[in-house]
Structures are given as C-alpha cells and as structure tokens.
A protein has these predicted regions:
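Catalytic tyrosine of NAD(P)H-dependent dehydrogenase/reductases that use a Tyr as the general acid/base
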Residues: 107-108, 143
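Catalytic-site neighborhood detector that most strongly recognizes the C-terminal catalytic loop/helix
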Residues: 132, 137-157
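Conserved tyrosine-mediated DNA breakage-rejoining catalytic core shared by Y-recombinases
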Residues: 15, 20, 24-61
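Active-site/catalytic core of tyrosine-dependent DNA strand-transfer enzymes
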Residues: 52-102
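Ser/Thr-centric signal marking residues that sit
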Residues: 15, 82-85, 113-116, 139-140
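Short coil/turn motifs that cap or connect alpha-helices
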Residues: 18, 26-28, 124, 135-138
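C-terminal catalytic core of tyrosine-transesterase DNA break-rejoin enzymes
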Residues: 10, 14, 111-135
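Single conserved hydrophobic/aromatic residue that forms the stacking wall/gate
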Residues: 1-9
C-alpha cells in the first residue's frame, strides 16, 4: 500500500500538476476512461490534467488496496487516513531522494523537468503552458531549461 502510494504520487507529479493540486484531488475527480482528472490550481482555477497508462494502472491498484472511505485521492497511511498535505508530500520526496543519494528533491523539480522534457521533444510552448496551468507564457519559458544541443540542432535545421 505504501509503495503503491509512492508510485502514484510520483506518477501524478509527472503530469505537471502542482503539489497543491495533487493533494486537493478527490477519488471522483479521476476519469479512468479518458485518463484525466480535474484539478483546482492557483486562484482555484479548474483545469484538466492527463495521465498515462502506467499511472492508470498504479492508481487503480492503489485505490483497490484502500480500506478507508475518505474522498481524498491521497491519504495518510495510518488511521484516521486524513488527506495528505503539501508538507507530507515534500517530506516523503526528500526521504526518497536521500535513499538514492539525491539532495534537495522537491515536487517543483518535477514540473521544471517535465516542462524541459516536453519542449525538448517538440511540444509547442503554448501546450506546455496549458499543461502546467500557467497564465503567462513567460512563466513557462522560465521553467524550461533549454538544452544547448537542441539549440544547435534547431539552428542547423532552420537557419542553414
């Protein structure tokens, strides 16, 4: 159950959602058929977030193992199974990071990495902006760390 929850949290963070959005999700916000869920971001703005087939499998297993009736998607491991908090996720990620000799593991790094990977793979910046729930595209540009090799390839492709 613990391992399943960890995998689910890791998978959910790979969607690009904020940790604050993650902890607000309820079970019935999940649409397994469409592999998406509704999250409430900054300013309580609603948006859709998408997840892959692996995440769907992990989420279903996790929910099958749950015995509590809390509507929250992620809850504490012990009674009374209260909704997981932002600090709870952050502490757990730091612990997991230390286990594999990574310092300063933070949920926000998942968002930055996801933005960078999406752009590196050719996802249009406007779609990355929407995926991350940014109002301003400047915020998205600030998140993404541009790979110098990709700059070189793009230069050769477009300007040679």
């Amino acid at each position: 159950y613990r391992r399943q929850r960890q995998m689910c949290i890791r998978d959910r963070l790979s969607t690009g959602m904020r940790v604050g959005e993650l902890v607000k999700i309820n079970r019935d916000d999940i649409d397994f058929q469409e592999r998406q869920c509704v999250v409430f971001g900054k300013g309580n703005k609603e948006r859709e977030v998408y997840f892959n087939a692996r995440t769907k499998i992990h989420l279903k297993k996790y929910l099958e193992q749950r015995t509590d009736t809390n509507p929250a998607l992620f809850v504490s491991l012990h009674e009374p199974h209260t909704r997981l908090t932002i600090s709870g996720v952050e502490v757990r990620l730091r612990q997991l990071g230390k286990r594999v000799n990574l310092n300063k593991v933070h949920p926000h790094k998942f968002r930055r990495t996801l933005a960078t990977m999406a752009i590196d793979k050719g996802m249009p910046i406007e779609q990355v902006q929407k995926m991350l729930g940014h109002v301003k595209i400047d915020t998205t540009l600030h998140y993404a760390m541009v790979n110098q090799t990709n700059v070189k390839i793009a230069h050769r492709k477009f300007l040679n």
